[in-house]
Design a protein with these regions (language model features):
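N-terminal leader/targeting segments
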Residues: 1-75
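Tryptophan-centered motif/residue detector
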Residues: 58, 93-96, 156
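Extracellularly exposed regions in secreted/surface proteins, prominently low-complexity, repeat-rich
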Residues: 8, 13, 17-20, 124-172
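Functionally engaged cysteine thiol sites
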Residues: 67-72, 108, 154-163
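Long, charged/polar, surface-exposed segments that mediate recognition or autoinhibition
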Residues: 75-124
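Short, Lys/Arg-enriched charge-dense amphipathic segments
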Residues: 60, 74-90, 134-151
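Alpha-helical protein-protein interaction elements
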Residues: 6-8, 50, 77, 88, ...
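Ser/Thr-rich, low-complexity intrinsically disordered terminal regions
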Residues: 59-71, 115-138, 146
Length: 172
């Protein structure tokens, strides 16, 4: 039944999203650029953490996934829940300030500048965590207790191809 129903469109939507939602996503970088930067950032962070924490070897533990954007639901934009990375070696409390600061410094180069939570006065008996956000809703989560873990979720973005299609279909 639902497959035959026409899609619900908002005012001014010509098939690619309402002007407000689509306009916001067209102004953002292409999803491909964001994902490439995310991968570079993770590579830099895991390399630095491996230097700080002896024996730390970061491995991709799962594949990522993507989902439509709630905030930009009329568009083809997607949020990418990146792969989960794990090091079997936890960050000791004595190294947590240095490790978490390294993550903050590297993430800032990629636009993740809003530190929303950071464990202070870490102990080896409690979970240590760091969460950093970017201006477009991206989130970097880094934590440690019995092992260390990291995942980066992007904000909502359109692919270059989706942007091209939307621009070509726009009323002239």
């Amino acid at each position: 039944m639902f497959d035959t129903m026409p899609p619900v469109k908002g005012e001014g939507d010509y098939g690619y999203g309402t002007p407000k939602e689509l306009g916001a996503l067209l102004a953002r970088r292409d999803a491909e650029e964001v994902l490439a930067d995310r991968d570079r950032m993770i590579t830099e962070i895991t390399a630095e953490l491996s230097q700080i924490v002896p024996g730390g070897n970061w491995l991709r533990d799962s594949e990522g996934t993507s989902t439509p954007c709630g905030e930009f639901g009329s568009t083809d934009g997607e949020i990418d829940f990146g792969p989960h990375y794990v090091s079997q070696i936890p960050v000791p409390a004595s190294l947590w300030p240095r490790a978490s600061q390294a993550v903050i410094d590297i993430a800032a180069k990629y636009g993740y500048t809003d530190v929303t939570s950071r464990t202070e006065n870490a102990t080896d008996e409690t979970h240590k965590d760091l969460t950093i956000r970017d201006a477009d809703g991206g989130r970097l989560a880094f934590g440690s207790l019995e092992a260390s873990t990291m995942q980066v979720t992007t904000g909502c973005y359109l692919t270059a191809e989706d942007k091209r299609k939307a621009r070509e279909a726009a009323p002239k």
